[in-house]
Structure formats: structure tokens, C-alpha cells
Amino acid sequence: MPVIRNPAAEKSTKDERTASCTVRSRKRKADVAIFLQDPDDTLDCLEMTKKKQYQDRGQLSNEMTCKSPHKLIPTPEKEEHEPNPTSYPHFASLRFSPVSASPLPRLGWANQDDVWRNMLNKDRIYLRDKNFFEKHPQLQPNMRAILLDWLMEVCEVYKLHRETFYLAQDFFDRFMATQKNVIKSRLQLIGITSLFIAAKMEEIYPPKLHQFAFITDCACTEDEITSMELIIMKDLDWCLSPMTMVSWFNVFLQVAYIRELQHFLRPQFPQEVYIQIVQLLDLCVLDICCLDYPYGVLAASALYHFSCPELMEKVSGFKLTELQGCIKWLVPFAMAIKDGGKSKLKFFKGVDIEDVHNIQTHTGCLELMEKVHINRAVLEEQNRASPIPSGVLTPPQSDKKQKSDPAD
């Protein structure tokens, strides 16, 4: 007997099979997603889920027990623990208060106090150590200066931004502080890999991997750079967003020249002024002792040498007495910069004229370091010869004071 087909029943069965396959497919994809998920993210999600369930259960309990809506008092969220402030060897007296007044103007896109607090916290979290060369007996501090000077040259060749260079400098210094017994032949690999990471984070169109390997004259292969990239990021605990020296300086100079608050994110300062002051940062960063001071302090002290104390205090939030140590340390560098004359703005093909000041340039800072050492020796000799520090005025002796006119 022929079997009578029921189209309606077949359609229902087909829909059920399709739905079942869809469920299995979705479940399979979910399993893959769970497998690929970061274990730390999974733990965070579990903690968030437990917290949410606890809060929901508490809210439900309140709704059941409280008869009046006004008795439902929401529990304030717990504030995240702020990192403990880190003391610098020569800057231990400075402490930033979370409620200190922010020098930033009122912002339309964020609370200026929150932005300022976040900037200060980054200077606490990202730690540097100028004594990390003690862990590497085969290395000398001048090797760091040579490497950073070469990275500046690489940045100019590939038209990379200043922020990219200063990110690479921060990655290099913090990574070296986590290592021991690094040999000289590995130093260039660590430096170019730090720049490779920074370029991928900061540049819109970063150079390709083979370009970074090529610029080392094949001393570093592509495989070595990618392997070192993972090592650096792991040892830095994936903390790759510091507030660099040039970031602080950009903020201070922008506050000094701000005219229209709605355009706060657009540079409003003269490029020529920017170039003169940022050259001081390019020079002092070659000295390992710059790691004694927070980046914000270095930027404010550099601004002091090219402006007045009142302006520096207004735009940075620091007091002059708080920066005296860093200001004094920068004197030989500022003397070398001013003796060399004004820097000229460089123009690059394919770079917008409004952005040329942000391109890292190579201005021969390594040669200027020789003048810095000479200036430092001269200043130390003057301080030994005179018991009075330079720049300090003393009142005249009593017998040499001018006598006032009785008629007055």
C-alpha cells in the first residue's frame, strides 16, 4: 500500500531538525569561545556573576521586607583601591593628594579632576629604576644612551611620532629592570622590539615587521623580534599605557595656550615653542638619572627652564619648592640646549604641516651629552669654590647697609 505523505507533518519535523542543528551549532561555537577565552577573563566574569547574583538577591530581599519605597537605601559601590604612592629616591617629599586641585580646565567630555587623578596614578603605577644596570654586569649606562639615540634616528627615518619613541623608552627601561645578566648583543633586539610594540600601539600605519628587522642591518630577524615581543609584554604584565614625558608636556603646554575649551584636544600652542622645549626632554632622557623623577616632574621642570615659575605652577599643579631637585638636575642640559641655538622645525613628505612637530627627530643629542658633562663639571666646581649655591641672594652685612634718610 502506498504511503500517504503528510506535507504539514514533514515540514514540522524538518523545522524541529533545523532548530536542533542550530542549537547544536550554537553550542559548539559557544564551547569554542569558552575554550579560547582568557582564564583571567573567565575568573573575572565568574566574580562579576557572583557579585551580581548577590546584589540581586539582596535587592529582592529588601523589596520583600521593606513596605515603603523610601526605606530602600541603595548600597554605594565600593571604590577601587588606589595604588600606593611610590617614593622616588630624590623625590620622596612629594605626595599627590587625590583631592588636590586640577590645573586642567573644565572639560565637556570628562571630569577634569578624574582625568588629573588618573594621570597622577599612572606615574605611581609605572615604576622605573635607574639602578637596573647593576643587574647587568656586562652593560654600561652609556649603552642605553647610544641605543635611545639610535631609536630616535629610526623614528625619524620611518616618520614615527614622539609618543611612539617615549613609549619605547619606557618599555625598555621597565623591561630591563625585570631582567638579569642581559648581554650586550641582545640590547639592540630589546630596543627595536620595544619600538615595534610602541609603533603598533601608537601609529595609525606602523612600519611592517620586516622593516624593523631591515633597519637593524639584519642583526635582528623577524622571528627574534616576534619572540622578544611576547617576552617583553609578559614581563611588563601587559601594562603598556604609561603617561610618558611628552604626554605630560603636551598637556602642560596646551593648558598654557588654551583659548577655546571646545577645542582642548587640538594643539593650540606654537610649534616653534614646542620644539625648543621638547628638545630638552630628548636630551635628558638619554641620562639614566632621569629615572629618578616621575615623568610629570621632568616635563614641568623642563617647562620651567623656558618660562616663568608662575606659569609652570599654574599649568602643572606643582609648587616650585617641590621641583627644585629636578630643576637643578636639568640645569646642565638646559645650558647645552641654549648654547646650541634654536632648533628648526623639520618638515616631512606626507606629514600634515600641523603634525610635523609631533614627529620624533634625531638632533644629535648624543653629541650634546658631551657638553652636558662639561657643564656639570663646571657647575660642581663653582659650587665647591663658593659655599653659597648659585642663584641665592644674601643680605649685605650690617656695616655696609645703606642708612635711611631721617627725613623719610
UniProtKB/Swiss-Prot annotation:
Gene3D superfamilies: Cyclin-like (1.10.472.10). Its main location: nucleus. Residues 398-408 have a biased composition (Basic and acidic residues). One of its GO terms (cellular component) is cytoplasm. One of its GO terms (molecular function) is cyclin-dependent protein serine/threonine kinase regulator activity. It holds the Pfam family Cyclin_C. Belongs to the cyclin family. Cyclin E subfamily. Phosphorylation by CDK2 triggers its release from CDK2 and degradation via the ubiquitin proteasome pathway. Residues 1-23, 66-86, 385-408 are annotated as: Disordered. Keywords: Cell cycle, Cell division, Cyclin, Nucleus, Phosphoprotein. It is found in: Nucleus. This is G1/S-specific cyclin-E3. Essential for the control of the cell cycle at the G1/S (start) transition. Interacts with CDK2 protein kinase to form a serine/threonine kinase holoenzyme complex. The cyclin subunit imparts substrate specificity to the complex. GO terms for biological process: cell division; G1/S transition of mitotic cell cycle; positive regulation of G1/S transition of mitotic cell cycle. The modification Phosphothreonine is found at residue 394.
